[in-house]
C-alpha cells in the first residue's frame, strides 16, 4: 500500500481464550461483594485478553481483533470495532481512550475525545477516530491502539433552581484562576 503509514506490531503470543473462563461471578471478600467486570469476546478465534502495562496501570490495553485502515482527513470518522462486549458492574462505567503513544506517533484522535460506555450497554465496544496525518494508517490485528478504564460513578440528585450562590473565590470566566 503506497503512501500508507504502518504501525509496528509486536506479535502477541496468546492463544484464543475460552469464553467461559472470562465470565466471573461476584465473589465475597471479607464480607463484602467484590465487583467484577465481565469481558466476553465477540469472536473467540480473534480475541486477545486485555492487559495492563504494569501492576499499577489504571487502564487495560485492548488488542485489535482485525486489521483496520484509517484514511486521512476529518470528513468521516472511522469506526473501529474492539472485539469485546462487557458486563459492567453496577455503579461503574467504562472510558475508552487512545493509548498516548498512538496519538503521539500516528496522529490519530478520537472523534468524541473519550468514549463513555454506560453500565447497561451490552453491545460490542467500538471507537471512532480521525487521522490527522498525511497518509492512511494501517492498524494491524493485535495492535494495542485503545485502552479501557473502569470508572466509578457518583450519582447525585439534580435540582433546577432560578439562581446559584456567588460565594466563591473564582471569577466568572474560563481561565479565571490565572495563566
Please annotate each region the language model reported.
Residues 1-179:
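DUTPase catalytic domain/fold
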